[in-house]
Amino acid sequence: MSTTSSHSNVVGVHYRVGKKIGEGSFGMLFQGVNLINNQPIALKFESRKSEVPQLRDEYLTYKLLMGLPGIPSVYYYGQEGMYNLLVMDLLGPSLEDLFDYCGRRFSPKTVAMIAKQMITRIQSVHERHFIYRDIKPDNFLIGFPGSKTENVIYAVDFGMAKQYRDPKTHVHRPYNEHKSLSGTARYMSINTHLGREQSRRDDLESMGHVFMYFLRGSLPWQGLKAATNKQKYEKIGEKKQVTPLKELCEGYPKEFLQYMIYARNLGYEEAPDYDYLRSLFDSLLLRINETDDGKYDWTLLNNGKGWQYSAAKQHVVQRRHTQGTNNRRQSTIPPYARTRQNLLSSPSKQTPVNNVVDASVATQKDGIPGKAASPQVQQQQQTSSAQQQQPQRVEQPAPQTTQPTQVDTQQAAKPAPSKEKSRKKFHLRLLSCCISKQE
């Protein structure tokens, strides 16, 4: 049963919905506030008609992992009208976002500090009997801006996580082959490309690919072309196999090569030595006369003002450009058309100021003013947005030729313009939330 109020825009009894800050294959993401303690929250909406619903499984996984450092808390799961709703902690930007702000290169010091946190995060997940299976920069976020945890790296989006052993008996899942591809092709392990059952070693290898991506700016298997997605994934896997680790890590601190060699030589059921892996990056910091002081590249931007200043500055430029474009478009429309267009686009006076979705997509056809537009419209918006964004994960049997649900399509050096726009909007809204909270 829906608990949404058409006047106060409250869901789940005491969660007020604010501005939309993102969307993807899962659905839509909004910022909001817990009316009991005034805590900022994130609300994820997923169509109940989704062919592959994920929010319920994600909620259950979060509940099993809750309490671990770097794992966001979840507060509510339920149904709101035509949507499933998950309420959780509101966090900051992803490592992919911060990578863009830093010119698509991180310093060895920053990558070493990131590596230590990511290793610890994945170790915690493994100790709860899960493997992540979709390691990528987009799935690791820093804490809420201005909070005590603003530089803590959080692991999010456990839609593809899987138990690798029985939590009661601790018996490991048996080794299998001819498995489906699960993960993001750019970062997945060689064994995953070969259709082998994933285990803890595959998470570690994927992390190594992420570390080298941060250092290099791109990976050798990006930008490969093929007639079909299946052929493209095969090409990516082949390129990974024929690229020597020395060549992949050439010109960068030796500790990254040592990490990759260790990860690729782990056995299927072998327990990783996480302490050893962290010690590699402690040694690196010591060798380059640095310390793990929490001063990441993104905190040093703009003479120490940080990434927030870049986000706000870029949004002002984007907003001016958008306003200029809209004005030029209006000048080309006949007066009668402009009048009719404005009438059609103007929200009803009965529509609340803060809608569950933007006013431009809220309609009276949905029954209650302020409710989301029809699931069909939202599904089309989600699909078009997901296709334009960063490398997307694959979950498809390797021998089949059917179209995967998500494709690794991002060009490494130049992100797609649509992705840039959505990211800038995200950061402005996040900043406005921070400012209003401080006031």
From Swiss-Prot:
The keyword Transferase is annotated on this UniProt entry: yes
Low complexity bias spans: 372-413
UniProt xrefs under Gene3D superfamilies: Transferase(Phosphotransferase) domain 1 (1.10.510.10)
Annotated catalysed reactions: L-seryl-[protein] + ATP = O-phospho-L-seryl-[protein] + ADP + H(+); L-threonyl-[protein] + ATP = O-phospho-L-threonyl-[protein] + ADP + H(+)
Subcellular localization(s) per the UniProt record: Cytoplasm
Record has Signal as a keyword: no
Active-site residues per Swiss-Prot or TrEMBL entry: D134
Protein kinase domain mapped to chain residues: 15-286
SUPFAM superfamilies in the record: Protein kinase-like (PK-like) (SSF56112)
Family: Belongs to the protein kinase superfamily. CK1 Ser/Thr protein kinase family. Casein kinase I subfamily.
UniProt name for this protein: Casein kinase I homolog 3
Lineage: Eukaryota, Fungi, Dikarya, Ascomycota, Taphrinomycotina
Gene: cki3
